[in-house]
UniProtKB/Swiss-Prot annotation:
HAMAP family linked: CsrA
Protein name according to UniProt: Translational regulator CsrA 1
GO molecular function: mRNA 5'-UTR binding
A cellular component term, taken from the record's GO annotations: cytosol
Organism whose genome encodes this protein: Pseudomonas syringae pv. tomato (strain ATCC BAA-871 / DC3000)
């Protein structure tokens, strides 16, 4: 895992198309702004897991 130290307003890039900016820090919370092409889906981990579980359940129901 890459660990970075950034100040508010600073950015880092992921590949050529994704930029992440530190918008703010409040206690234990960090606000991030993510710029990515519309065809790249960006989700929080818990939302991504829910989507993956739902798709898995749908696939299981459609199998003969």
């Amino acid at each position: 895992m890459l660990v970075l130290t950034r100040d508010i307003g600073e950015t880092f890039s992921i590949g050529d198309d994704i930029t992440v900016q530190i918008l703010g820090v409040n206690g234990n919370q960090v606000r991030l702004g993510i710029s990515a092409p519309k065809d790249i889906k960006v989700h929080r981990a818990e939302v991504y897991k829910r989507i993956a579980n739902k798709l898995s359940q749908q696939a299981a129901q459609t199998q003969p």
